[in-house]
């Protein structure tokens, strides 16, 4: 015992001498033996001496044994060599040493830090004697800022709150270490490290934190590369394993894994302790090896250097690419013990065997084949039983998928949850709303190569091209009219029924065509979205704009039959696409109700029917999709106003048309009066019998202006075109329904 005491005193001599020559050493680590030989310095700042006057600090005798290099070199040199083992000290000797050192201090003061017994250290234990120094490195790195860690039971030291940090200023010989690298794990109560965060801070309720989470610091130090923590694990010959040959391997005593490198073994041993020294500076994730951190940083950079040559899928790690390549090969190394089926990955095998255990195998009852997923099994069953049909209970329609039936039932229930924010139009499907929104943006990427008309959707352009072929493959079995598209025939069948599926939600009025409803909705707002191309006039309805351009500007939408395009086609003469540009300038707003309706003027039958017929012609004309305009100038008309038309088909005698301006009496009427007439009759079904004849006479008188003597003379085909206008109007009504079918997407 006396010999051991002498050895301790001999070690205290140079230690005290070194402590004198290092005035910059932290006050809290000053050895107690130097009090008598040097001026006593209080371990606490001036502002905190009051609350801590009843405490004193005395480090344990063995706490400074692990730092001989720090005292020998003035604290500025880092240790480069492996540390030596901590000598074993008998508990009785250690207790006597602690008793003697305690007697040197003032007997009336309580120790600030309780001194635990030194743990036993044998050759195969991890030497963490440097943990104390690492803790001070952490505090220096934080600069007095607290770090969220796993709470340890604090000791009741003082009741009143004090400033959060009272340690001295940081010193230059402590390296910058990220705080999350120090204690990302639970500190047990029997840990050899006697200090904790609560030892230096006042008693306060512990904060609930998640394990291994690091708060990002606002300083510039967090942006720097994280240094590797010097956690000391001593590897000696006891870890060596003889495997034969010249190769040396070191084995882990816990799990018996062996490595050719001591560094890899140290990293592995730290993994058993939960220590992950390498932290990501962006997300705070911890890793055991630096290479794992480098690989993890690729995910933040978006870099995937390893690419599959078969499917061009990229990965961040080579191991992931190798595992992926097993999908493209026929090698299935993992076989099921029940059915001997091979799998590329162990996870797939595990999931497959779990199905055997629970009895949920995807096996075809017809042929006995097994499938990985239930969806593949259902797809396979269609080869035996045919496609599964889901029938609608309302209209007996069949669908292949239940989702299609569900969407179809929304039409019967009039559920349209997707509403356009621009015009208030409602849709059943979200992609229908997305396609409709393109019309408000004016995006038309698809152009017809024949007439040059542009379309928003490719499907609409393909349907439009069928019109140029003039092949009408779909015929109505009631009136024997033929149509180009099947959707148009479906829309045509509304004419033969009393069903009016389109209803105004504001006034309850019903319509059998969508465009009639859309035109009617403009009446509930003050907007006039249709603007004339030649003057500042604006109109609520597109039909009114068409009539205005014909009457005021002499722009005709239809040409003559003699031009070689056939009836229902336009003359490609000038300003191609003027009517095509008659787009909706600004959508109507249902929230803007009309404050007062304008006076409705009574008009003769010819004027009212003319307004309706012109709108019918315009709406049907849009379906032809190849309309172009032919300008007309009143100054070019002959002064005599006499145009020749054949009276008889056999003689072709010419006669003068009586009062050619009689049919145009209402042209000088105010535009608002004409618009109100159209709005009053919009949405009503037209009785073609009797009214079409009057419209034909009206159109014949208006079109007679185009038969100019200077340009081209009257012809027999021109006469036939206007003579049989009443038959053409019926076809115009059907073309309106074609447009309605396109809008509905039938």
From Swiss-Prot:
GO cellular component: nucleoplasm; nucleus
One Pfam short name: zf-C2H2
Tissue and organ expression note: Expressed in immature and mature dendritic cells (DCs).
SMART domains: ZnF_C2H2
Molecular function GO labels: DNA binding; nuclear estrogen receptor binding; transcription corepressor activity; zinc ion binding
Domain of life: Eukaryota
Stretch list, region Disordered: 1-64, 587-689
Compositional bias annotation for Basic and acidic residues: 675-689
UniProt biased composition (Acidic residues): 613-627
GO BP annotation list: negative regulation of intracellular estrogen receptor signaling pathway; negative regulation of transcription by RNA polymerase II; response to estrogen
Annotated keywords: DNA-binding, Metal-binding, Nucleus, Repeat, Repressor, Transcription, Transcription regulation, Zinc, Zinc-finger
Short motif PXDLS, span: 587-591
Compartment annotation: Nucleus
Transmembrane segments: none
ZnF endpoints (C2H2-type): 250-272, 278-300, 306-328, 334-356, 362-384, 390-412, 418-440, 446-468, 474-496, 502-524, 530-553
The keyword Transcription regulation is annotated on this UniProt entry: yes
Region of interest: Interaction with NRIP1: 452-746
InterPro entries hit by this protein: Ikaros_C2H2-ZF, Znf_C2H2_sf, Znf_C2H2_type
Subunit field text: Interacts with ESR1 and NRIP1. Interacts (via PXDLS motif) with CTBP1.
Function per UniProt: Has transcriptional repression activity. Acts as a corepressor of ESR1; the function seems to involve CTBP1 and histone deacetylases.
Protein name: Zinc finger protein 366
